[in-house]
Amino acid sequence: MKKLFVYVALMLPIVLLSLNIQAQTADEIIEKYITAIGGKEKWKQVKSMKVNGFIEVQGIKINFTQQAIHNVGVRVDAEFQGQKIIDITTPTKGWSQNPFGGRSSLQPISEEELKQKLDELDIQDEFIDYASKGSTVEFLGKDEEDGNEFYKVKMTSKNNNESVYFFDVNTSLIYKEEKTVKQQGQEMKMVTKVFDYKTIPFGIKIPHKSEQMGQILVTDKIEINTTIDENIFKGN
């Protein structure tokens, strides 16, 4: 028993020190990232956002508009072959209309679908004041891809959604996000690469292109703190 006590007494400070270094490393990476995208104070001024762009799939372009009010609601509207595609998320409910996915009219989404989408309501970037939002982070070390080095940080949100982010060692910007999502009852790994970062007139830096499962999303226009009618977040 005495030997065990001595072992614990010796090891505990080392374990605590290791955990402290790990947390500090993750926080340092996050702090540099926030600085690189315009700074905490600027991002905390973002109350609403309207984005126009298009998704390119196998040479076909699908225009979309995304409107969001911070922690109130997110709505995406698109049209393809004359069919409307709508996606609405609020803190308590969500709706979806996608004729190509079996939903010909606006229908409520399941609790599981809503849980996976709740983090999207935070439009001030998930890493801004992440701890006060109920999220935790973990430094996973370094990784390399195409000759470039990246820091890996896992974030677990208050909604228990997990994502692994890859931060470019040189620019401090996010290059990739990996997460597991459930679709039609099956788990699926989702990898999203983001690039073409641009500083918009508001003074924050946002990626204008992303790639996911062979689809390219291109952002043409971003409006910050524009007036958005909250009624657009009402389903049926």
Per-range role (PLM):
Residues 51, 76, 94, 137, ...:
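Well-ordered beta-strand positions enriched in small/hydrophobic/aromatic, beta-favoring residues
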Residues 88, 142, 176-177:
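Residue-level detector of high-confidence beta-strand sites
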